[in-house]
Amino acid sequence: MTEKRRIACFFTAGYTELNAMKAFMRKINDTVEYIQLCPIGPRKSRSAIQNRHIDRIDKNQNGMTGEKLIQFVLDFIKEKRFEEEGYDALLIEDDKDNRFLSIEENGIAYIDENRWKCFKDGVAECIRERYPSIPVIFFYAAPEVEAWFLADWENSFGSVYKNTFTTQQNDYFSVKFRKYVNDCILTDRYKNCIEKYGYFEGKYRKLSEEIQDVLERIDFLGDYMPELEHPIISYSKKIQGEDMLERIEPKVILHNCTFFFKEGYWALQAF
């Protein structure tokens, strides 16, 4: 039996990605083995290693993103371990956040494809100084993984609270919250081009924080059952984020995330 090719995976070190990102990648290409090198849990005991669901991120990696993540990759490939373990490709997954955008005079952003290409070329060149032939896959969530959730609503915010709400409550919440997201968070500027989010009048708004804030401030069931008690919800990257990353379907996301996600999707599927 032919052994699966091995991909060294360096994911942005957040709790959404910790336990669920490999499974998400397998939905795109299940013919390879994904070795997660970042983020990992603390190495304290055999039982912790045997526990497939990790509760905490190693303190040296926690929150690693952007330049720190890239530097971690470049340092890791210099270790003897990387050479000995024999990887066939390298995958870097990160939140794009407010990078690789240029701001127009009206304060709205557009994707700076040249800046994105220069970034990838620079990182790949550093990696290939040591491993000239290794493929490097850049899989960036633009602006954050929450964009993927919004792109596949039915498998994310449309269903993640089903165990908290009744069926009727969930249906009402899903419709109301989706309308609010489109009208007030994404707005007409970005609801059809979510990967360009989120400069408004030259100031950047972080998508995950906007979602967390509105779910804390607004009771979307208040006008549905104002005189009755109903569950109060919130959004946590560690809880709902991980759950939704396990649920969402890459093929659905492709329809709405047509630049950064599409590039990573096809590169991974073709490997």
What is each residue range found by the language model?
Residues T2-R5, N19-H53, D58, F72-F271:
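C-terminal accessory helical subdomains adjacent to catalytic cores in phosphodiester-
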Residues I7-F10:
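Conserved beta-strand elements of the Class I
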Residues A13-L18:
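Short acidic, Gly/Ser-rich segments with clustered Asp/Glu that frequently serve as metal-coordination loops
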